Amino acid sequence: MANITAALVKELREKTGAGMMDCKGALNETNGDLEAAVDWLRKKGLAKAAKKAGRVAAEGLVAVESAGRHAAVVEVNSETDFVARNDGFQAFAREAAKLALNTDGTLEGLQAATFPGSSETVQEKLSNLIATIGENMTLRRVAKLEVSKGVIASYVHGQINEGLGKIGVLVALESEGDVEFLSTLGRQIAMHVAATNPTALDASGVDQAVVERESNILREKNAGKPDHVMAKIVESGLKSYYKEVTLLEQPFVHDGSKTVSQILKEAAGKAGGEVAIKGFVRYALGEGIEKEEGPDFAAEVASMSR
């Protein structure tokens, strides 16, 4: 039997919102496999079906740089928040984001680019910064968006300096409409993305392995139902899931009575042309490494737009 530690039980509780004894039982049933325990609890109806809470432990900065119809976002990690507030570290993150605008959008391409004002590559500059400050740092990831017509809107949450913060979002709006209107709308949608963390633009973009996992959970929770009933249950359950995780189907943070898709349709008349989201990127600092975000994060972002 696996050693079920208090720390493992605590982590499962934080992921699912289930009670302590239920979490212990789930871990015992799954031999200490955390992900299997999450599914076990959901099949028993003891855990929320919502996405896992974003938990991060890495410090550093997310930097955003935009220039009209193209923009980039990078994440640079450090060991401590103290270093993230260092002028040299911030200057590096900002320059890395600017450089990313003119690269191929890959991490390798950015690392190999020449750092402004020197003969060093970006990676060499970072290595020298590590030696100077005395703390390990990593250029973790980069993304770039472009549109031929329209705007790339951006938003930085937890901003500590211009374009630098804890969460960076880019939203590509494709349209021949009024640029000023599109910029305002794009920023609102970027704030929405920061708050709700959608995993895909629409249902077609959701990983099929995830869809199958959700379908299996629905089937096991409703085992014994006739086939025709089960099919409707799975279909309905997936529709609800897509409303949680796909950007176009989510209720708009700034007006919960409408979905993002409905907001875009209404925007066409005001913009003077159809408006479509070509893509979006959301980088949260240290995503995937342990540290809990505040419980009222969505409300916090929404309140900032009022």
From Swiss-Prot:
This is Elongation factor Ts. It holds the Pfam family EF_TS. InterPro entries: EF-Ts_dimer_sf, Transl_elong_EFTs/EF1B, Transl_elong_EFTs/EF1B_dimer, Transl_elong_Ts_CS, UBA-like_sf. It comes from Methylorubrum extorquens (strain PA1) (Methylobacterium extorquens). Residues 80-83 are annotated as: Involved in Mg(2+) ion dislocation from EF-Tu. Associates with the EF-Tu.GDP complex and induces the exchange of GDP to GTP. It remains bound to the aminoacyl-tRNA.EF-Tu.GTP complex up to the GTP hydrolysis stage on the ribosome. One of its GO terms (molecular function) is translation elongation factor activity. Its main location: cytoplasm. GO terms for cellular component: cytoplasm. It comes from the Bacteria. The gene is tsf. Keywords: Cytoplasm, Elongation factor, Protein biosynthesis. It is found in: Cytoplasm. Belongs to the EF-Ts family. CDD domains: UBA_EF-Ts (cd14275). PANTHER family: ELONGATION FACTOR TS, ELONGATION FACTOR TS, MITOCHONDRIAL. PROSITE patterns: EF_TS_2.
